[in-house]
């Protein structure tokens, strides 16, 4: 049996206003990924409880733009290969080289845990790349997933790279809430942890965001970016290894930066 630890908390949108039409478009694309077959307007409308006219308008627009077609007349709609072309172009122009993914693969192999690359996005961090552990009991993260910047190890490894004034401005915008009993509830508490952890060079999350999940992260200032490389896994396996794994991540990242700058 495989047991997977997943960050399931959903970030509140705060001041961000979702554009419904765009959100619906992405929902539809993800539906095609799950269905793996042509879908009719009726099936799409029923899946999302959309008015038939709304589903028709979205589908018609995507057909007109060349993103959907009918493999068989009146047999439903399916994405065209234009999506693949776009994805390939984006991948080819990715600002991070393949060697960064290789570093995650190496560290996942050496530690036996899930490794991920995180980048700042306002008061959140977003996962850019993930290499999942092969262990039966493991932490799983999804590319594009967002987490609070102040309570996660990756987030604090990123905050540590900010100038004091910029960091203070970010911490001031955070809506502090108690995820777990040891969650940082003030900007001062976050700042104290950052100063305490700076001397060792890595940042830890002993279950302060999600129960049973521990994290370790180090800053990854690669080519002017302010990212973090982080490890996630079950508390029972990771907590006792905070120091050894933190030092391993720090050494590996320092070596990578020297070889690739």
Predicted segments, located by residue:
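Short amphipathic alpha-helical signal-transduction/dimerization elements
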Residues: 33, 155, 159, 163, ...
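Amphipathic alpha-helical regulatory segments at dimerization interfaces
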Residues: 31, 47, 99-110, 116, ...
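Intrinsically disordered, low-complexity polar/acidic regions
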Residues: 179-180, 211
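Extended hydrophobic
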Residues: 186-255
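Amphipathic alpha-helical effector-binding/dimerization core
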Residues: 74-173
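Short, structured helix-loop boundary elements
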Residues: 19-22, 76, 80, 93, ...
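N-terminal helix-turn-helix
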Residues: 1-93, 254-259
């Amino acid at each position: 049996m495989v047991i997977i630890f997943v960050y399931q908390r959903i970030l509140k949108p705060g001041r961000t206003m979702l554009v419904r039409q765009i959100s619906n478009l992405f929902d539809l694309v993800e539906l095609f990924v799950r269905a793996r077959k042509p879908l009719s307007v009726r099936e799409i409308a029923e899946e999302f409880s959309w008015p038939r006219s709304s589903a028709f308008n979205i589908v018609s627009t995507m057909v007109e733009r060349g993103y959907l077609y009918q493999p068989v007349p009146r047999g439903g709609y399916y994405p065209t290969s234009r999506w693949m072309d776009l994805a390939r172009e984006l991948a080819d122009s990715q600002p991070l080289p393949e060697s960064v993914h290789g570093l995650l693969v190496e560290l996942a192999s050496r530690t036996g845990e899930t490794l991920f690359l995180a980048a700042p996005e306002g008061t959140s961090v977003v996962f850019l790349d993930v290499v999942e552990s092969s262990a039966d009991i493991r932490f799983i993260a999804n590319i594009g997933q967002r987490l609070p910047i102040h309570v996660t190890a990756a987030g604090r490894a990123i905050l540590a790279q900010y100038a004091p004034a910029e960091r203070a401005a970010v911490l001031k915008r955070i809506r502090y809430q108690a995820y777990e009993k040891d969650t940082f509830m003030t900007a001062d508490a976050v700042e104290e942890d950052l100063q305490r952890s700076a001397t060792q060079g890595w940042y830890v999350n002993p279950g302060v965001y999600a129960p049973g999940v521990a994290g370790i992260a180090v800053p990854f200032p690669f080519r002017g970016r302010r990212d973090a490389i982080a490890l996630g896994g079950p508390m029972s396996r990771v907590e006792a290894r905070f120091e050894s794994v933190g030092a391993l991540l720090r050494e590996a990242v320092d070596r990578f930066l020297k070889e690739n700058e």
